[in-house]
Amino acid sequence: MVTIQADEISNIIRERIEQYNREVKIVNTGTVLQVGDGIARIHGLDEVMAGELVEFQEGTIGIALNLESTNVGVVLMGDGLLIQEGSSVKATGKIAQIPVSEAYLGRVINALAKPIDGRGEISSSEYRLIESPAPGIISRRSVYEPLQTGLIAIDSMIPIGRGQRELIIGDRQTGKTAVATDTILNQQGQNVICVYVAIGQKASSVAQVVTTFQEKGAMEYTIVVAETADSPATLQYLAPYTGAALAEYFMYRERHTLIIYDDLSKQAQAYRQMSLLLRRPPGREAYPGDVFYLHSRLLERAAKLSSLLGEGSMTALPIVETQSGDVSAYIPTNVISITDGQIFLSADLFNAGIRPAINVGISVSRVGSAAQIKAMKQVAGKLKLELAQFAELEAFAQFASDLDKATQNQLARGQRLRELLKQSQSAPLAVEEQILTIYTGTNGYLDSLEVGQVRKFLVELRTYLKTNKPQFQEIISSTKIFTEEAEAILKEAIQEQRERFILQEQAA
């Protein structure tokens, strides 16, 4: 028979009492009243904060956006098909944040920073809030370094600087994405990290962009954030902020970044959908009252940081789609007023075969020549003036039949300059090549050629200079000035190439 010893029992009881943890864990919970269309109404969640993440019983995450007296309106970050009425919801005490690290370079991710390219998990130990405050006035400095796009029309007349926000605006199918992707391709070797955010696009279009980046070797310095047209509105709304958080991570590490939002019209539509389903009062074009703040808080995060913060930069190229050229609609006017200039793409120019279809007359960069190297300033001033005069004369020449010789010459020069601005897609030009192209056109060296021969001649001239006179490129890249020596080399090369070209044409 086992003897029961009282002191042993009392020791065990004493130990258990000492181990007893009196911590009380308070969980803020609620119950699903209604769910559907990506929105859930929750009863309870008394302590929930605006923008806080909430977790449903079956694992779906949502964001508490509407805090009303009787219930909480939550937008779902998923389809929410398994959420049932009456199931429980708990507040997480966190607001939306994503992991960030160098390992994201070369990957395709979604708005929650989860990889969607089938290449496994991304290791990361650091987190950043999706919504971070923009740098203040003291944290910034004015934009002064150029960010070359590789497109002559932009780099010469609508220059973009590091830390600038330049809107790309135009109708559908006018080449907006092409301008943005060419800019990314041109950052090769420039030590610029690129983030391309695709919002509400066809999956096939995003796949095409990613393939282009891979073929041209641009993926190694690029992150693609994609939420396609079949994604929930919540994720389409969050995607740009995810991209901005990733770009900021590099910016605060003294790196230069370029971010493209393609496009903000789709983000505004997703936000409108969420707001209307949450029964927020609609305003102009049925957008909610805070749609301006939606874009301003996103675009204000682009900055050129002060020397104290390491002089990193984040350049933003938001894209906005217009309906039949109407820039006075709500979203276009909002984004125009937030950004530091706009590149306007015209359907008429596109259909006339002028590509990139940039309407130089109404496009503008509010940073201006501060974002150009001296060599480009030296040759580009004349180009803008001559093109403006040509546009005026061309309209006038449609009505006048007998034009004097000077006007005819100016029209002929203008046609050749317009030809010089045409570029193939995915073929950005280095700044040295742009300078020689513009110089050749503005100084009349193309006047003797037929309009149809201009592009062929320029391609051959660029190749000739690269192989036979590499010192031209060396002078421009080292001094950033179009020196007399560089001009002499260029004149000589143009002369030699013209003679060769004329002989070739005669032989043909």
Curated annotation (Swiss-Prot):
Gene Ontology CC terms: chloroplast thylakoid membrane; proton-transporting ATP synthase complex
UniProt keyword list: ATP synthesis, ATP-binding, CF(1), Chloroplast, Hydrogen ion transport, Ion transport, Membrane, Nucleotide-binding, Plastid, Thylakoid, Translocase, Transport
Alphabetized InterPro entries for the sequence: ATP_synth_asu-like_sf, ATP_synth_asu_C, ATP_synth_asu_C_sf, ATP_synth_F1_a_nt-bd_dom, ATP_synth_F1_asu, ATPase_a/bsu_AS, ATPase_F1/V1/A1_a/bsu_N, ATPase_F1/V1/A1_a/bsu_N_sf
Domain of life: Eukaryota
Top-level EC class as recorded in UniProt: translocase
Catalytic activity of the protein: ATP + H2O + 4 H(+)(in) = ADP + phosphate + 5 H(+)(out)
Cell compartment(s), UniProt: Plastid, Chloroplast thylakoid membrane
One Pfam family recorded for the sequence: ATP-synt_ab_N
Main location: plastid
Gene Ontology MF: a single term: ATP binding
Record SUPFAM superfamilies: C-terminal domain of alpha and beta subunits of F1 ATP synthase, N-terminal domain of alpha and beta subunits of F1 ATP synthase, P-loop containing nucleoside triphosphate hydrolases
EC code: 7.1.2.2
Keyword Translocase in record: yes
Membrane topology of the entry: Peripheral membrane protein
Record site feature (Required for activity), residues: S363
Disulfide cross-links: none
Binding site for ATP: G170, D171, R172, Q173, T174, G175, K176, T177
PROSITE patterns in alphabetical order: ATPASE_ALPHA_BETA (PS00152)
Subunit structure: F-type ATPases have 2 components, CF(1) - the catalytic core - and CF(0) - the membrane proton channel. CF(1) has five subunits: alpha(3), beta(3), gamma(1), delta(1), epsilon(1). CF(0) has four main subunits: a, b, b' and c.
Function statement: Produces ATP from ADP in the presence of a proton gradient across the membrane. The alpha chain is a regulatory subunit.
Family to which the UniProt record says this protein belongs: Belongs to the ATPase alpha/beta chains family.
HAMAP family reported for this sequence: ATP_synth_alpha_bact
Name the UniProt record assigns to this protein: ATP synthase subunit alpha, chloroplastic
Organism: Helianthus annuus
Gene: atpA
